[in-house]
Amino acid sequence: MDIRNNDPGAVQYGNFFNYYQFSSAAERVKLLPDADIWLPALEDGETQKDKPYFILDVGCNCGVLTQLMHKYLEERLHRSVKVLGVDIDPRLIQRASEENESPKDVSYACVDVLDDEAFESVKTYMEVNNLEKFDAICCYSITMWIHLNHHDQGLRFFLQKLSNLAELLVVEPQPWKCYQKAERRLKKAGEIFPLFLELKWRSDVDLQIQKYLEESLDRRKIFKSAPTKWQRKICFYR
């Protein structure tokens, strides 16, 4: 984990070690919708309760929200829920694995989603579980870090890559003021995000993400949560 100038908030990839001390996972879970949003519409008489519900949680950090989301959905979907949590930071993944309360249903892997070689572990998980797509892929508060490090086209590629593997795509974009704060903290530590000034998606980045998902990836927004204390909204696209 690259912490600059002894400031735990000055990180390049959003891999905060104490993230859930200032961003309550329990409060986030309260904003999640009920079962009807998570499940696809079924034909009369069709049921999938005997099948596990598979989730990929991208940017899972140390797994606190992953664990709470797993419990939340098992209680509401009334079926087995399987979650693969991935994060770029091996120390966060180690911590998540050590504190895993449901090792039969929840697993973790150190994966950079934009690294094709690293992403093979996700594809292997899909093959082992006979998945063409995940029932849901969740991206909680990570789009900014993809954007800052991989430019507009990198963020679009990230969204497209995950959209292709998801029945339901859950995105919680950070607003532009979060970018400005991240840039200030890194600059104060003596470094910068080299691509920051080149970004075209800026003050309306959350709307640009929605527009791209709807117009380019043919997604439809079916739910938007109330704002978190950081004024972020969790959006569900099918």
Swiss-Prot record:
GO biological process, one term: methylation
Sequence similarity: Belongs to the methyltransferase superfamily.
Keywords: Methyltransferase, S-adenosyl-L-methionine, Transferase
EC number in record: 2.1.1.-
Entry-linked InterPro entries: Bin3-like (IPR039772), Bin3_C (IPR010675), BIN3_SAM-bd_dom (IPR024160), SAM-dependent_MTases_sf (IPR029063)
Name of the protein this chain belongs to: Probable RNA methyltransferase CG11342
Keyword Ribonucleoprotein: no
PROSITE patterns (UniProt xref): BIN3_SAM (PS51515)
Any matching Pfam family: Bin3
GO cellular component annotations of the record: cytoplasm
Superkingdom: Eukaryota
Task of the protein: Probable RNA methyltransferase.
Residue ranges of every copy of the Bin3-type SAM domain listed in the record: 1-238
Gene Ontology molecular-function annotations: O-methyltransferase activity; RNA methyltransferase activity
